[in-house]
Amino acid sequence: MILAMDTATPAVTAGVVRLEDVAVLAERVTVDARAHAEQLTPNVLAALADAGLTVNDLDAVVVGCGPGPFTGLRVGMATAAAYGHALGVPVHGVCSLDAIGVETRGDALVVTDARRREVYWARYRDGVRVDGPAVNAPADVPADAHAVAGSPEHAALFDLPRVSPVYPTASGLVRAVADWTAEPAPLVPLYLRRPDAKPSSVAR
């Protein structure tokens, strides 16, 4: 059983997925950009309860590593690492855009909110990333796709048919892992630019 989580977008996502057939046994999603820290652990516990499982039934964890805001990413990645350490199971990190794009078909553009009037984006062909991830103003994003997925507010800026999903899903996170048998790489946040939130400096 796989615990999947993502906090790279306003959606606080946690789900339990059976790896063999990528069946989602339970998924909890709270859309609140200010509640990542408050909602992630309750969503994890609720998803486990919905699935009739406990943490001891988990074989691995997958977490979206961005791109996304500094504070949101930190919550998801720290939580995933803590579960992995406590349970002694591997933790796989994936690009959060891939967790959306892997569930699209044809030539699809995926966009999420990067703030500062910009979007994070990547382009996919039948679920495989072929360009990006990158951060640009919407007008500077290559729009040579046939559809757009991701943040509804930002997808609306493109003259393309909109498709789902709008946020990373538990099944998408699991599908985005290239090789479940491989040793996972260390978790590295994908910011694509300097974080807005920085540790406060101490005056000397």
Residue ranges with predicted function:
Residues 32-49:
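N-terminal phosphate-binding loop and adjacent alpha-helix
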Residues 44-60, 141-146:
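Phosphate/pyrophosphate-binding loops at sites that engage ATP/ADP/AMP, CoA/4′-phosphopantetheine
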Residues 51-56, 84-94:
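Phosphate-handling active-site elements
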Residues 62-89:
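DPxDG-like acidic metal-binding loop motif
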Residues 1-23, 35-39, 92-204:
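Oxyanion-binding and handling regions
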Residues 26-33, 65-69, 162:
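A short glycine/serine-rich beta->alpha loop
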